[in-house]
């Protein structure tokens, strides 16, 4: 019982210290426009924040696997142009 209590207590402390995750709200990109950060759900590219270095990085709204819903969802992505994963 003490072990379970200690585990729950440590998890609670971790949540307080680290905070909760982003709620997919909008952020402000370097051009002072409201946009959605990487990993946020989107319906088109225009909703996503642009990378600061557009020569090295690109961005798009693409399908990604969402383990919580068990399905593919469209999310904002920023990746290196030279990467094979982009």
From Swiss-Prot:
<dbReference type="GO" id="GO:0099106">
    <property type="term" value="F:ion channel regulator activity"/>
</dbReference>
<keyword id="KW-0528">Neurotoxin</keyword>
<keyword id="KW-0964">Secreted</keyword>
<keyword id="KW-0872">Ion channel impairing toxin</keyword>
<feature type="disulfide bond">
    <location>
        <begin position="42"/>
        <end position="61"/>
    </location>
</feature>
<feature type="disulfide bond">
    <location>
        <begin position="35"/>
        <end position="49"/>
    </location>
</feature>
<dbReference type="Pfam" id="PF17486">
    <property type="entry name" value="Cys_Knot_tox"/>
</dbReference>
<comment type="function">
    <text>Probable neurotoxin with ion channel impairing activity.</text>
</comment>
<dbReference type="GO" id="GO:0005576">
    <property type="term" value="C:extracellular region"/>
</dbReference>
<dbReference type="InterPro" id="IPR035311">
    <property type="entry name" value="Cys_Knot_tox"/>
</dbReference>
<keyword id="KW-0960">Knottin</keyword>
<dbReference type="GO" id="GO:0090729">
    <property type="term" value="F:toxin activity"/>
</dbReference>
<feature type="disulfide bond">
    <location>
        <begin position="79"/>
        <end position="86"/>
    </location>
</feature>
<keyword id="KW-0800">Toxin</keyword>
<feature type="signal peptide">
    <location>
        <begin position="1"/>
        <end position="19"/>
    </location>
</feature>
<protein>
    <recommendedName>
        <fullName>Toxin ICK-18</fullName>
    </recommendedName>
</protein>
<keyword id="KW-0732">Signal</keyword>
<keyword id="KW-1015">Disulfide bond</keyword>
<comment type="similarity">
    <text>Belongs to the neurotoxin 21 family.</text>
</comment>
<feature type="disulfide bond">
    <location>
        <begin position="48"/>
        <end position="76"/>
    </location>
</feature>
């Amino acid at each position: 019982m003490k072990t379970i209590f200690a585990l729950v207590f440590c998890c609670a402390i971790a949540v307080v210290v680290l905070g909760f995750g982003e709620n997919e709200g909008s952020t402000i990109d370097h051009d002072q426009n409201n946009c959605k950060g990487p990993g946020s759900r989107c319906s088109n590219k225009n909703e996503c924040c642009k990378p600061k270095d557009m020569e090295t990085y690109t961005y798009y709204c693409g399908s990604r696997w969402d383990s919580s819903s068990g399905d593919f969802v469209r999310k904002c992505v920023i990746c290196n142009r030279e990467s094979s994963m982009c």
